[in-house]
Amino acid sequence: MSKRLRSSEVCADCSGPDPSWASVNRGTFLCDECCSVHRSLGRHISQVRHLKHTPWPPTLLQMVETLYNNGANSIWEHSLLDPASIMSGRRKANPQDKVHPNKAEFIRAKYQMLAFVHRLPCRDDDSVTAKDLSKQLHSSVRTGNLETCLRLLSLGAQANFFHPEKGNTPLHVASKAGQILQAELLAVYGADPGTQDSSGKTPVDYARQGGHHELAERLVEIQYELTDRLAFYLCGRKPDHKNGQHFIIPQMADSSLDLSELAKAAKKKLQSLSNHLFEELAMDVYDEVDRRETDAVWLATQNHSALVTETTVVPFLPVNPEYSSTRNQGRQKLARFNAHEFATLVIDILSDAKRRQQGSSLSGSKDNVELILKTINNQHSVESQDNDQPDYDSVASDEDTDLETTASKTNRQKSLDSDLSDGPVTVQEFMEVKNALVASEAKIQQLMKVNNNLSDELRIMQKKLQTLQSENSNLRKQATTNVYQVQTGSEYTDTSNHSSLKRRPSARGSRPMSMYETGSGQKPYLPMGEASRPEESRMRLQPFPAHIGRSALVTSSSSLPSFPSTLSWSRDESARRASRLEKQNSTPESDYDNTPNDMEPDGMGSSRKGRQRSMVWPGDGLVPDTAEPHVAPSPTLPSTEDVIRKTEQITKNIQELLRAAQENKHDSYIPCSERIHVAVTEMAALFPKKPKSDMVRTSLRLLTSSAYRLQSECKKTLPGDPGSPTDVQLVTQQVIQCAYDIAKAAKQLVTITTKENNN
């Protein structure tokens, strides 16, 4: 396969890049994840092969590539290409989708249910429709249009259809026309190369008469594909059909199973099976060989990046609904056979297939017809099961059964003697070493990947630790350099002398400090009736460095849902809030519509938008609120340190509430809401009963009302009337909204307090 062709290929099911598997009967290429789902469906739905690590007949691979390049995938996704399918909500899987359930459900609908295949108009008789389709297939195989034939086969055309007027099958027509790729496609869908037409000729005869020698040789290989695959599984070689040799039969030498009466009885019952039952058993063993070989390739090609992956494991043959329950159960029990037992069964099948093909007679009497699977399964005496148990039971682990002890253990080596081999070949050793090597390589890759992941995580943790230590050191330095110095004597004036205080212009270029930054330094607490001069605050306050803009305490809640943290915000957010405080009116950020949005006249008498009423110093002529005329408005606010300390308590309790919501611990809602309410009450008590600023009043109102709403919503989680169940999901949304409002109000109060106290 050319590199240019392979680089442009994508998975037919999820459009992932660089597919490494192929579905032979569907004409598509698959990625690893989609292939795992195909394997779980069974070979009757999808026949998967690895593009590099599986031996391919050249013409078979060419047939799959031709189908893929000619758009065979559009056959299985016909309705998805219709624009109307977008309106119906159906869509194709994406590479980022999870294997379960997204990709698995789509693949089952696409190939097992054929939900997206173009449907013909309904007719009263389905047999007439199938007959018409088969006649169209009979006419199409003489051309090289593979996609048309695959479309007819997907609609129900029969690959072995015998044309009543022409007296032959589609494979006869394709062989006579020399269409080797059409012959490959028909053989995949069950066409028999040994079928004779009305003249007694086979497709091989027509291929040789037409001079298509490569096609004739390939048809012979297809005719012996089952026995060739079984022989190749045991000894890694295939017969030389060109020279007339069609069977390679390894012989078990000096084996205890061959000498046991149980093995002799099993072999005798195998020989007594009718041709029909023997064909069924041989096909089941062929499917089991395909499963084991695909398993070996699967383990060797996976990177084992995780201890548990989403990809599907296929421990035994999947159920085929066209087979009986007894046959499906017997097919699944083939997975119990260890390497030696399965090799013995394969050799017996090869021997009897050769005998039946050559027409040799049996010596001895014939027993009653009975499936060989039931007899050989009696060797597992410890794991014996009743046939009345439910079908498709789980297959036990592949543990080898101890063989009967013999007199000399040194003479127990089991070897295979092929009729063309130069020396003995040990089946058990070959299979055990092969399986052990594959398992060891997979384990090594898995451990190396896990080791690399752990090393990467360790490096990341070390970097995070160094970053936290550096930030902690910087914060300590800033705390020592920015401590407010408590001045004595004339640095504070009597608050009664309001004329000595002047309003300081707002510093538009500075950004408001985050709550964690402000809390790092210690500022003297001013009583309710006192305030520091703006000039002195301006001289003593130094801005924090730009790199300290986010609190390290919030990292513990990074796994919680998106939530406005009251402990930190980004530099851009801080600058935006500072600009909003200085340039806009006094309306705070709120989700409610009853917030006042009016103008305040400045000292010159002109109405200007953007003057902050909360940034007013005593003596500026405040107008008392008419709501409570007996309470005089207070011009002072609590210290920033006290507000931050209470806000941190609120934030900690909100984080506990959100963790409870994330973990569905609804019984923790009420205790968390009570702790939040207590913290909110303590924070509200810091502020005067009648604050001067509209922003402070609005934020306090939002803070307290949201706390009461939170308690009310959390009480809804208590078990109530059984007739009216509570929608827990809706309650959780309301609880999160209330917590959001509380955090938002607390952040507004911190911003206002920080701005006021810095002026």
Swiss-Prot record:
MF terms in GO: GTPase activator activity; small GTPase binding; zinc ion binding
Keyword Signal: no
Keyword annotations from UniProtKB, A to Z: ANK repeat, Coiled coil, GTPase activation, Metal-binding, Phosphoprotein, Repeat, Zinc, Zinc-finger
GO cellular component, one term: nucleoplasm
ZnF (C4-type) intervals: 11-34
Biased composition (Low complexity): 555-569
Keyword Coiled coil applies: yes
Pfam families: Ank_2 (PF12796), ArfGap (PF01412), GIT1_C (PF12205), GIT_CC (PF16559), GIT_SHD (PF08518)
Domain Arf-GAP: start-end pairs: 1-124
Lineage: Eukaryota, Metazoa, Chordata, Craniata, Vertebrata
Entry superkingdom: Eukaryota
Organism, scientific name: Homo sapiens (Human)
Biased composition (Acidic residues): 385-403
Annotated segments matching region Disordered: 379-422, 480-538, 554-643
ANK repeat coordinates: 132-161, 166-195, 199-228
SMART domains: ANK (SM00248), ArfGap (SM00105), GIT (SM00555)
SUPFAM superfamilies: Ankyrin repeat (SSF48403), ArfGap/RecO-like zinc finger (SSF57863)
Modified residues (Phosphotyrosine): 484
Role this protein plays: GTPase-activating protein for ADP ribosylation factor family members, including ARF1.
Protein name: ARF GTPase-activating protein GIT2
Gene Ontology terms describing biological process: brain development; regulation of ARF protein signal transduction; regulation of G protein-coupled receptor signaling pathway; synaptic vesicle recycling
